C-alpha cells in the first residue's frame, strides 16, 4: 500500500460510514456546502466540535453530519488565554518608565479635560425619566449622571440610542 503524502485532502471512511454515505445518496439528501464547524452541547456543558464536517439536509429539515468529533474544553482554552495575557503583561520597570514619560509630557492636554467638568457642575432636570434608565445608561456608557440624563433627553428616553451616542 502506498503512503499518503502530508497535507493531502484524502478521507478514509469506515465500512459503516461508507454504507451511510451510500444511503444518503439514495435518499437524495442535499449537501450543505460552506459549513466549517459544527458543535453539539450536552446538558453538562460538554461540547463536541466537528471541524470541516460533511453536512447533509433532509427534506424534513433535519441534518446529518459526518466528521471526526473532538471534545472541546473551554476551561483549557480560557487557561491558555490567561497564560498568554499574563506573559504579555508589562514588567514593573517598563510601567514606571511609561508613567515617567507621561508625567514629563506637556500639561497642555489637561486643559480640554477641564471642559467636561464644567458641563457636569450644574444639576440637570431628571423629571420624566426613569431612575433605572439613567443608571443603566451611566453603567453601560461609563459616564456621569448629568451626561446620561442629557443623552436620554436628546433621544426621547431611548436607552439604546442614548448609550450609542455616548459610546462614540
Swiss-Prot record:
One of its GO terms (molecular function) is phosphatidylinositol-3,5-bisphosphate binding. Residues 100-115 have a biased composition (Low complexity). Residues 129-168 form the UBA domain. GO terms for biological process: cotranslational protein targeting to membrane; protein targeting to membrane; protein transport. InterPro entries: EGD2/NACA0like (IPR016641), NAC-like_UBA (IPR044034), NAC_A/B_dom_sf (IPR038187), Nas_poly-pep-assoc_cplx_dom (IPR002715). Residues 14-78 form the NAC-A/B domain. It comes from the Eukaryota. It is found in: Cytoplasm; Nucleus. Signal peptide: none annotated. Keywords: Cytoplasm, Nucleus, Protein transport, Transport. It holds the Pfam family NAC. Belongs to the NAC-alpha family. This is Nascent polypeptide-associated complex subunit alpha. The gene is EGD2.
Amino acid at each position: 500500500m502506498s503512503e499518503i503524502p502530508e497535507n493531502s485532502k484524502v478521507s478514509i471512511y469506515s465500512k459503516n460510514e461508507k454504507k451511510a454515505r451510500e444511503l444518503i445518496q439514495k435518499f437524495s439528501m442535499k449537501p450543505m456546502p460552506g459549513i466549517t464547524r459544527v458543535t453539539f452541547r450536552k446538558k453538562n456543558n460538554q461540547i463536541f466540535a466537528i471541524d470541516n464536517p460533511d453536512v447533509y439536509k433532509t427534506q424534513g429539515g433535519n441534518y446529518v453530519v459526518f466528521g471526526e468529533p473532538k471534545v472541546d474544553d473551554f476551561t483549557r482554552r480560557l487557561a491558555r488565554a490567561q497564560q498568554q495575557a499574563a506573559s504579555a503583561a508589562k514588567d514593573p520597570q517598563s510601567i514606571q518608565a511609561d508613567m515617567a514619560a507621561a508625567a514629563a509630557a506637556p500639561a497642555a492636554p489637561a486643559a480640554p479635560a477641564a471642559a467636561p467638568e464644567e458641563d457636569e457642575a450644574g444639576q440637570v432636570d431628571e423629571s420624566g425619566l426613569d431612575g433605572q434608565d439613567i443608571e443603566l445608561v451611566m453603567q453601560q456608557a461609563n459616564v456621569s449622571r448629568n451626561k446620561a440624563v442629557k443623552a436620554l433627553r436628546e433621544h426621547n428616553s431611548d436607552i439604546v440610542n442614548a448609550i450609542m451616542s455616548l459610546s462614540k
